[in-house]
Amino acid sequence: MSQDLPPVITIDGPGGSGKGTVGQRLAWKFGWEFLDSGALYRLVGLSALKKSLDLSSIAVISDLARNLDAQFAVKEGEQGAEGIILLEDENVSAQLRTEKCAQAASQIAQIPDVRDALLERQRAFRVAPGLVADGRDMGTVVFADAQLKIFLTASAEIRAERRYKQLKDKVSGVSLSAILAEIQERDERDMNRSVSPLIPASDAIILDTTEMSVNDVETKALQLAKITFQEELPN
């Protein structure tokens, strides 16, 4: 990694593996910037849905992505670090949790022109004192020179249960079986797509979180960060 660039921790993995929660906690603890790259795609999808745009139109969606006005923030919530996502200054965090929005994001993420449009935007989040980047190709493509790369995984069943618990009180009509089917479908699509498939970086540390709590994963990630960055991290 260039010594002129701020440090980066990448946390990749499939949906429901815990990468978002752990990433937010690390960013909050270190006072670093946070990037939820998956949210960028969901933001493009949400914006397209709000504007009734054709998700298969490469030119239209690429232009939307290129001009997307999005911001991330991490604040202290009732259960620790809590992320806030803004689209054109509107807090759309709750709107992004729907599976319809997630499906739109996965669909447009397969369009190379959209990925190119968002690549520069993602890299612009790399500012001092550092960045925690959560996604699917942070360690393989966006920040391939990151000093610490973590890849979280878990069984589809466990990830579906976690997502169900997140959504059941916030989204009406949600069912565990439907979430599991959608997760399995997204896994298949994400792992087999031609552009940036969901795979660990060759130098990533892989953590299976199936039998781990969020606190367990956070503790392990903190240990890895302290070993990697040493004096660069606040006490």
Where are these regions (language model features)?
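Residue-level signal for inorganic ion chemistry
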Residues: 38, 89, 118, 132, ...
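Walker A/P-loop
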Residues: 20
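ATP-dependent NMP and nucleoside kinases share a basic, alpha-helical "lid"
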Residues: 93-170
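Small-molecule kinase domains that catalyze NTP-dependent phosphoryl transfer to phosphate-bearing small molecules
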Residues: 122-128, 136-141, 145, 170-220
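Hydrophobic anchor at the beta1->P-loop junction of P-loop NTPases
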Residues: 11
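N-terminal phosphate/diphosphate-binding loop that engages ATP/GTP or pyrophosphate donors
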Residues: 28-97
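ATP-binding Walker
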Residues: 16-17
